Amino acid sequence: MNPTAMCNPSSSSSSSGSSSSTKAWIVHGVAVAAAVAAAYLYLTRPAKFRSRVVGIIPARFASSRFQGKPLVRILGKPMIQRTWERAKMATTLDQVVVATDDEKIAECCRGFGAAVIMTSESCQNGTERCNEALQKLEKKYDVVVNIQGDEPLIEPEVIDGIVRALQATPDAVFSTAVTSLKPEDAFDPNRVKCVVDTRGYAVYFSRGLIPYNKSGKVNPHFPYLLHLGIQSYDTKFLKIYPELPPTPLQLEEDLEQLKVLENGYKMKVIKVDHEAHGVDTPEDVEKIEQFMRERNFL
């Protein structure tokens, strides 16, 4: 018997095993190196990374759905005041200001003690208004929180949550929050839906129901997400946002978040246990007042 022939299978098997083992170690080494690099970048960030934070409440009088919405009274107080009072309770904000192009809104806000920044009428959305207000502030900030003026019951903890998420995620330039979507809001275009990936980054936002299954019906077992409309930005990104070209999805859905995603930037999303109470139409005022009365939230 040829001893060489007897050894060949064993030798081949050994060689194959060795090759597989080597490949496994290479893959493992690459993964470890990537983890070490990520940890290094995280740990070597400046000690005060994104530490200076300003909250800006953009407010405009003109609205196709609800003219003069910021000044509508909710149980005796202007809605913009209720939003400002809630924002002031957030512990991560160094300052809270209102940005508006309307003198009536500015006068109202100064009356209850809010700092006001006057902006131009040319701002296309709240993000652009926040950017213009940022340029006019005397102090320098690392993070801007865009606080929707039509969320008079916004939880301070939600504001703090998105700020901390942005501070902890160096590769994201934007952060926002979502909560569970109610079945009755599934097909309401005023309730923006969101899908996220397994790492908590935004994949898409839509006024339609997403994901949308073949039956065309709401799946009662699927955890649909509702966007809360509050967002924070790294100020370096915010300054270039107006220069980014409008994108097809942004224009089709009329959602400024899509401009960020379509231009290739990352957006961190946190899930919170918060019931959304946005005011989009005059009918919403009565609903939110009833909610506040029931909970003695005056």
PLM regions: where:
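Terminal low-complexity segments of carbohydrate-biosynthetic enzymes
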Residues: 1-16, 27, 266, 289-298
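Terminal signal-anchor or tail-anchor transmembrane helices
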Residues: 7-10, 14-46
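Short aromatic/basic micro-patch
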Residues: 65, 73, 153, 232, ...
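Short, high-confidence coil segments that cap the C-terminus of an alpha-helix
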Residues: 93, 139-141, 169-172, 265
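Short phosphate-binding loop-to-helix
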Residues: 97, 103-164
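Conserved core of the sugar-phosphate nucleotidyltransferase
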Residues: 154-247
